């Protein structure tokens, strides 16, 4: 069995966000890194524009966990100018009325809209600039031979489509929710794969900039816009060019579902009925709806994440989650930081490194998977209820009174690096306290704050 000290090179499968960031971490540790990526180089202009792959959002929400990992490798200074801060959720009701619900209780508690492509380009460039990272594009991994440490792949442009192979010392799969490395690990170990489809899908749409040259926004740019409609919702995140990327989340089947929207007339009717204020904002609604793929939503959990001293998976390859807490990318970036910490002792065996990483991360990735599912209900439905706003206001008040003991769960997840499992545990206690305090209150001034202080001391006193 080998150690990190006697392993000069690491092979990564997948040069997306997690893979490119992990390559930087590993290069900084002194490793030579080879990245195998099925796509062609996204930084090069292609002869014809290819449609975005289903399941790959145009823009993402960057929060404190992701920022912390990016700061560790020194790329945040270059990224800040490309980010758009979002201070809260801008709710659009069915009458077109707007209401902003701040994310946090402090001015700096914001999340950021970031371009997936722009961030990937930044990370790929940073990885190559280390001088230790080689990226091989157009190579689709199709299997792993653990006996002789070979990765099998198909090379783009090979007219014969013959399987080729490359040797590896240590293999890490950062190849997303359909991971070939994960499949190989589970086949070799007889492991477990749990795929939990949500029963809802999503479609990306566009709200173009207000002016032809771009740069002018049709709505408030420093907010994440939500049209909550009970069983489904529409959201929109701002882009640097003045446009918004809107995402429609709908059930896959049913009266109001993707299955039912088979004609432009049906799409128009749904939007006129439930999202009327967006009609003037989306001149290409029909074109976008039928031109863009419908994305699939599911939670993926697997066990184990590694095989002996050979291979490991992380990010979506190990624990894909639904997007409703904006934490898929952030959790993957936190994975990169976590495996880097596990590598601080170069004399430990690789299988020990992998085991420690999984022991540390699995409870936390399970927790954020659960919280992401819960947040979908909040975003599409609960957020409309008066009691939600009362509990939100009360949670901020209690945070002011007990800043070290009472931190809203959303804030723990988005603005801190408190482990996800701990945020979930503390959040459950806090939710019980909020329920008790608001059970007979219609407004904040009717809440018994002295009782709140006692409950927090009793239940969160040692937290």
Predicted segments, located by residue:
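Conserved N-terminal helical subregion
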Residues: 2-10, 63-204
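C-terminal helical "tail/cap" subdomain of flavin- and related membrane-associated enzymes
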Residues: 3-5, 341-463
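Residues at the starts of beta-strands that form the adenosine-phosphate
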Residues: 9, 32, 329
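Conserved mid-domain beta->alpha element of the FAD-binding
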Residues: 15-24, 28, 172-173, 205, ...
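Conserved Rossmann-like nucleotide-cofactor binding loop
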Residues: 18, 41, 178
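A short, Lys/Arg-enriched amphipathic alpha-helix followed by its capping loop at the start of a domain
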Residues: 22-31, 69, 130
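Glycine-rich FAD pyrophosphate-binding loop
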Residues: 27-55
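Conserved FAD-binding catalytic core of PHBH/FMO-like flavoproteins
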Residues: 125, 139-143, 148-297, 301-307
């Amino acid at each position: 069995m080998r150690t990190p000290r006697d392993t000069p090179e690491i092979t990564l499968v997948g040069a997306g966000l997690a893979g490119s960031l992990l390559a930087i971490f590993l290069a900084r540790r002194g490793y030579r890194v080879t990245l195998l990526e099925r796509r062609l180089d996204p930084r090069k202009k292609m002869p014809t524009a290819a449609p975005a792959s289903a399941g790959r959002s145009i823009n993402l929400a960057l929060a404190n966990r992701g920022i912390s990992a990016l700061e560790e490798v020194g790329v945040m200074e270059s990224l800040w100018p490309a980010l758009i801060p979002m201070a809260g959720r801008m709710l659009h009701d069915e009458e077109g009325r707007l209401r902003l619900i701040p994310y946090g209780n402090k001015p700096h508690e914001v999340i950021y809209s970031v371009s997936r492509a722009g961030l990937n380009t930044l990370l790929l460039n940073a990885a190559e600039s280390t001088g230790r990272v080689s990226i091989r594009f157009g190579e689709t991994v199709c299997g792993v031979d653990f006996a002789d440490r070979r990765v099998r792949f198909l090379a783009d442009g090979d007219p014969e489509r013959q399987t080729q192979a490359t040797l590896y010392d240590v293999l890490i799969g950062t190849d997303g929710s359909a991971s070939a490395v994960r499949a190989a690990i589970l086949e070799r170990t007889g492991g477990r794969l749990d795929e939990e489809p949500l029963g809802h899908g999503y479609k990306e749409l566009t709200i173009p900039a207000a002016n032809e040259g771009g740069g002018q926004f049709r709505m408030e740019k420093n907010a994440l816009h939500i049209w909550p409609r009970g069983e489904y919702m529409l959201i929109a995140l701002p882009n640097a060019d003045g446009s918004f990327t809107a995402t429609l989340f709908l059930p896959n089947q049913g009266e109001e579902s993707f299955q039912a929207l088979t004609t432009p007339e049906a799409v128009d009717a749904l939007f006129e009925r439930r999202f009327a204020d967006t009609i003037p904002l989306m001149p290409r609604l029909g074109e976008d709806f039928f031109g863009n793929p419908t994305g699939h939503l599911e939670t993926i959990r697997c066990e184990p994440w590694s095989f002996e001293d050979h291979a490991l998976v992380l990010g979506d390859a190990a624990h894909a989650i639904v997007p409703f807490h904006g934490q898929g990318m952030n959790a993957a970036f936190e994975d990169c930081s976590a495996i880097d910490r596990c590598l601080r002792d170069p004399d430990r065996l690789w299988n020990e490194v992998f085991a420690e990483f999984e022991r540390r991360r699995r409870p936390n990735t399970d927790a954020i998977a659960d919280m992401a599912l819960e947040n979908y209900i909040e975003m599409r439905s609960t957020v409309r209820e008066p009691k939600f706003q009362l509990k939100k206001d009360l949670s901020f008040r209690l945070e002011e009174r007990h800043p070290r003991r009472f931190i809203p769960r959303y804030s723990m997840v988005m603005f801190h690096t408190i482990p996800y499992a701990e945020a979930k545990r503390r959040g459950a206690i806090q939710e019980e306290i909020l329920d008790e305090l608001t059970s007979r209150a219609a407004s904040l001034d009717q809440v018994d704050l002295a009782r709140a202080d006692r409950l927090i001391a009793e239940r969160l006193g040692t937290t």
